[in-house]
Curated annotation (Swiss-Prot):
One GO CC term on file: outer membrane-bounded periplasmic space
Higher taxonomy: Bacteria, Pseudomonadati, Pseudomonadota, Gammaproteobacteria, Pasteurellales
Record GO biological process: anaerobic electron transport chain; nitrate assimilation
Primary subcellular site in the record, as a coarse category: periplasm
Residues involved in heme c 5 binding: 312, 353, 356-357
Residues where substrate binds: 251, 301
Protein family: Belongs to the cytochrome c-552 family.
Encoding gene (name): nrfA
InterPro entries, A to Z: Cyt_c552 (IPR003321), Cyt_c_NO2Rdtase_formate-dep (IPR017570), Multihaem_cyt_sf (IPR036280)
UniProt entry tagged with the keyword Ligase: no
Binding-site positions, heme c 4: 319, 322-323, 432
Name of the protein described by the UniProt record: Cytochrome c-552
Organism in which the protein naturally occurs: Mannheimia succiniciproducens (strain KCTC 0769BP / MBEL55E)
Length: 525
């Protein structure tokens, strides 16, 4: 039983570390409290789920939105350049945001944690909006399909990438859009995140220079309905946050209608525990882990959810206020900057933070960096324990463990990694809600300790000497090999795909008039 003793000591140590970090973050998170905005109550309402009696589950086939020939969407961003030069030119500057981090190469633990899932091959931090189509084409996760029916991913993987998506849903209906493989949309989804994703570009208000904000993706409107909101009648604060919720949210692919429909799991709430409860009740899993056999969940990018739990969300400060702040051109005309500044504290302080905060830029930069370091420290501790839990589960299976013996330990792994992923996939959670991030990670540490304690008992029962020997995953190359991923083969196939298939997609899209020029090919730095 030595394994149980070791793991229980570890549990106490890691939980203490998480609590210390949590206390520090909570002390620093008060910087904006004195400047609470008048929209506090409205923002609070946005966080609340609809009454239980109003809640429902994923839509049935009959409830999916049909073809809508009356909904006209001009997806080509370039066509708005002449009428809206300031907004368009600032949006085009997202092309300057070429840098991203190759996350799984920087942190090979992820390769193990995502074993059996495409994220183990490649996962990168985000860059400029203009690269959304380019990056989903180039990433190893989407494979190298040779025709419209090939490849590993469904059509739904295009859903956040640009305004061609609502155009296609209007033309094909939801069932038609969400059916089939990702490659089906290769010559159709060609305009990256842009104008018609957020604006009703055909309306008179838009032509008159008003924002005319709109959500044109039916699954997003259904999700807002679950929290008691109707986009069209919502106030400006809710709408400004709601358009970002087109994409910056947690979602899953529901297959009950025969397609891969995008659904937001908000039926019990939008916090990590409520979403987990929903997934558990419907028996959903994103995949089965390749070595531990745990039924895993993959958080997407729950920025909207985590923002709503933080100081800014609670006080009605929206994504647009910080990342797309008002600015002036050389003639003094005020407009919304569409460059989408990733780090406004460093890169746009006077137009954002300084409008509410009395602290200096240096002070706030140090505060945010400390939050990030605190979250990162405990997150890596959780990753270390998750990696060990997956290998320990594999060892238990290899030594004759049964499904009945393993089910509780595997469920604990599922819940622990879900919490890690919820915090990790929301790239700015250290800024949006650092105290919430640390609470989530601390609860993940508790659950992985529970998993490892259960596994220690199972391993001892089957005569396994503990601690077990863990493989060397100190580099991405070593981790890929341990997890059975032939990364060079994947890369060569993708290179051929980029060279041969993508030019044909671009050629077809241009011939149809869907784009004027092909999506950018600037490589990431």
């Amino acid at each position: 039983m030595n394994g149980v003793i070791i793991v229980n000591i570890l549990r106490k140590t890691l939980s203490s570390l998480a609590i210390v970090g949590l206390g520090f973050a909570m002390a620093n998170s008060a910087v904006a409290e004195e400047k609470a905005m008048a929209t506090h109550q409205q923002a609070q309402q946005l966080q609340q789920p609809a009454p239980e009696t109003a809640a429902k589950r994923a839509p049935t086939k009959e409830e999916l939105t049909p073809v809508n020939p009356n909904l006209k969407i001009e997806a080509a961003n370039e066509k708005f350049a002449a009428d809206f030069p300031r907004q368009y030119n600032s949006w085009a500057k997202t092309a300057e945001q070429t840098e991203f981090h190759k996350e799984v190469e920087d942190d090979p633990r992820m390769i193990v944690m995502w074993g059996g899932y495409a994220f183990a091959k490649e996962f990168n931090s985000p860059r400029g909006h203009i690269y959304a189509v380019t990056d989903v084409r180039n990433i190893l996760r989407t494979g190298s399909p040779k025709d419209a029916n090939g490849g590993p991913q469904p059509m739904a993987c295009w859903t956040c990438k640009g305004p061609d998506v609502p155009r296609l849903i209007a033309e094909w209906g939801e069932e038609g859009y969400f059916s089939g493989k990702w490659a089906k949309g290769g010559a159709e989804v060609v305009n990256s995140i842009g104008c018609a994703d957020c604006h009703d570009t055909q309306s008179q208000d838009f032509k008159d220079g008003k924002p005319a904000l709109r959500v044109a993706r039916p699954h997003v409107l259904r999700a807002l309905d679950t929290v008691g909101k109707t986009f069209a009648t919502s106030d400006r604060t809710d709408q400004r946050a709601g358009v970002c919720a087109n994409c910056h949210v947690e979602y899953y692919f529901d297959k009950s209608t025969g397609a891969n429909n995008v659904v937001f799991p908000w039926y019990k709430g939008r916090d990590v525990d409520s979403i987990e409860k929903y997934y558990d009740e419907i028996g959903f899993k994103d995949w089965e882990h390749s070595i531990s056999k745990a039924p895993m969940l993959k958080a997407q990018h729950p920025d909207f959810e985590t923002w709503s739990m933080g100081t800014h969300g609670k006080n009605g400060v929206t994504c647009v206020d910080c990342h797309m702040a008002k600015t002036q051109d050389k003639d003094g005309k005020v407009y919304t900057d569409h460059q989408v500044v990733g780090n406004p504290v460093k890169d746009n302080f006077q137009n954002t933070c300084a409008r509410c905060h009395d602290q200096s830029q240096d002070t706030l930069i140090k505060t945010v960096e400390q939050h990030k370091a605190d979250v990162r420290e405990v997150m890596l501790k959780l990753e270390d324990q998750l990696v060990k839990s997956h290998f320990e589960a594999k060892t238990a299976w290899d030594n004759g463990a049964t499904q009945e013996e393993m089910k509780d330990a595997l469920q604990a792994i599922r819940h622990a990694q879900w919490r890690w992923d919820f915090a990790a996939a929301s790239h700015g959670m250290h800024m949006h809600a650092p105290d919430v991030a640390l609470k989530i990670i601390a609860s993940g540490l508790d659950r992985v300790a529970d998993a490892r304690a259960k596994l220690a008992v199972i391993l001892a029962k089957h005569g396994v000497q503990q601690p077990i020997q863990y493989p060397d995953i100190s580099t991405a190359e070593k981790a890929w090999k341990v997890m059975g991923i032939d990364i060079e083969k994947e890369r060569k196939e993708k290179e051929e795909f980029i060279k041969t298939v993508i030019p044909e997609w671009n050629k077809e899209a241009i011939s149809k008039g869907l784009i004027l020029t092909a999506p950018p090919t600037t490589p990431a730095k």
